[in-house]
Structures are given as structure tokens and as C-alpha cells.
Amino acid sequence: MARFLVALLATTLVAVQAGGQLGHAAPATAEVFWRAVLPHSPLPDAVLRLLKQPAAGVELLTEATSFVRDAEDRPPFDYRDYSRSPPDDEPSKSTGAASGARDFDYDDYSGGDKLRGAASGARDFDYDDYSGADKLRGATDEYKAPSSSLAGNGASMARGGKAETTTVFFHEEAVRVGKRLPFRFPPATPAALGFLPRQVADSVPFTTAALPGVLATFGVASDSATVASMEATLRACESPTIAGESKFCATSLEALVERAMEVLGTRDIRPVTSTLPRAGAPLQTYTVRSVRPVEGGPVFVACHDEAYPYTVYRCHTTGPSRAYMVDMEGARGGDAVTIATVCHTDTSLWNPEHVSFKLLGTKPGGTPVCHLMPYGHIIWAKNVNRSPA
């Protein structure tokens, strides 16, 4: 895998040098593109950090080759898919619940409790597949709605053994000033190489069928843990959608923005992201201090970063939804965060076994199902204040 990353890094360096972008003073080409097409939308911090200047080649190479080690060190969770677990998944592998180390993905509503490998950090759930069941990665029975007083706020927490962990899904009634929710925010785990220049990203085949050839070209063993993560991401990008849903995967910042514009039917869009500490924050109870609706609905495009050596976003339309920016204050004092929140108002086409229904005690077509957008994930909304589209 290291050879693949070294070769990819070398290609990136050549491309950037050819474009005259080498050096910390010059903005990345993708950053120039963003400013040109989204002049009224500052680059979110998480996205800006992914636009790495390859001038620091040695440092970047160290980060890139560490992708293999990081993938192997991560817990056996992938919170981007709710598909069924293979028969050999073991509940005992679902570690980390007691310490609040579980995180969740909100982009797979079609799967069950499939363990897909440590594709993207300490994550259990996927947020863009609505047709599947309770992909709790072998730990389904350990998760249940809380019996604490917080349940009255419409929250549903993951519980492992006797220890409560972070909120996973919650009812829309919890998005009110004064409500309390327990959250643990994990450290950011961005792709090692960040966003590739578009010409480089477009030159690397991004399909399951092409992956063996790509790996062979760079002499990468096909049985490595990192390759398994890459395969899982490709499968997720190629998986079918539910009726009425649009989905795409973007391997460059330019493709991400252009495809979001295409799906929303207007070039006047804006990104909405959570403001969270990049280093993460420990489990604690947060109190909602203010709630601001996100205009531009009822359909948004939600984008979630995927496990790959370079940045890949998997995006999908949310279906009928309401979105909010929720300001919260942590019980420990000083820990203020703002979470971008999506509440799906029509779940009638979701799989009845979807984990959110189990945690919230509801069913398809019932009350809205809400979840936050983790660090680096993006909601794209029509900019209704500037465009009638």
C-alpha cells in the first residue's frame, strides 16, 4: 500500500508543480475554484484542511503511509452502511461502548448490521443507506433506548453493557432550546492525502472493477486491510439507491461542488457544516442553547467523507427533510459546539429494520428521524436568499 501512496503522492507533486502551485503562499487550484463559484461561502475549516499544499512532501508522505497503520488500529466499525452482518461477525468485537468510543454514520439506510471493516474510524453507523437494517456491526443487542430522564427529550442513545454512550438518532422534539443530549465527538480522521488535484483524481480509476488493475500497477497486495477499506468505499459508492434518491461520489473538490449543484438544480448553493473541535470532545451532556432552521429545503444534499487514501465524499439527497444549526453548551463548561442537524420527515421507504426505528421506538412513515452531521461532513442547501431556484 505504501508504494501506491508514494506513487500517488509523486503524481500529485508533479501535477501541482506543473500548475505553478507549489509553495505555501499560493492557494490550491481547488481553493481558487471554490472562491470563484461560491464567492459568498467561506471554505469550511474541515474542507480547507483537506486542501494540502504538497510542498511539505516528506511530512505528507509520512501521513500518507500511516494510512495503513491507522486503518488497522481503528475499531472494527464502519458507520456508513446498515447492511447485514456476515454470519461470522462476533458481538464481542464491538468494543469501546463503555468509554463512549462509538460514533455513527448517517448515510446508509438500506443495510443491516454488516461489519465492513475499519474503513473510517471509530464509527458504527452509516447515514445514507435507508433501505437496510440495523448495521450495528454485531452489537445490535447492546443498543437500546435509554431509561434515563434524557429519554424524555426524544433522544436515543447507544448503550454498551451498562455504560451509556453518545446520542445516535433523536426525535425532532429534541431540537429545542433547553433540551439535553449526551454526545461524544471523535477526533477528525481525514484522508491522508486530502483532496487530490482534479486532474490527478480524474486520472485514477474509481470503480470496483478497476481497483485490481490500479493495485497491480502500483504493486499493492490485494489482501491488505487498507485495500479492504477501499473496496468497501467503492461498493458503497456503487450500491443502489432507494426510490427517488440521487447519489454520487466525488474524488475532488471541484467534482463535489459541481455535482451538488447539478443535483439541487442550481449553481447558487451553500455548504452547511458542524462547528466541532478537530481534536474531538469527550462524552458529556450538552444543552441546546439556540436553534436556527436551515433554509433551502425540503431536500438537501448530504455528503459524508469515506475511507480512502485521498479524500472521497459520498453524497446523497436527503429526501423530504428539515435541517437545523443547533448551538449547544457542554456540561463541563467551555465546550460550546454547533451541530448541523438533519431531520428526515418522510421515512416511509426506509427498511422497517433500520436501526433508528429500533433506537427511537418508531417505524417507517412515523415521526421524523434526526441525526447530526459529524466533523467534515457537509449539507448542501439552495441559497434561497440569493436565488429563486
Swiss-Prot record:
Residues 73-105 are annotated as: Disordered. Keywords: Signal. Residues 169-383 form the BURP domain. Specifically expressed in anthers, in the tapetum and microspores (at protein level). Residues 73-92 have a biased composition (Basic and acidic residues). Residues 1-20 form the signal peptide. One of its GO terms (cellular component) is exine. GO terms for biological process: pollen development; pollen maturation. Required for pollen development. Probably synthesized in the tapetum, packaged in Ubisch bodies and transported at appropriate stages to the micropsores. This is Protein RAFTIN 1A.
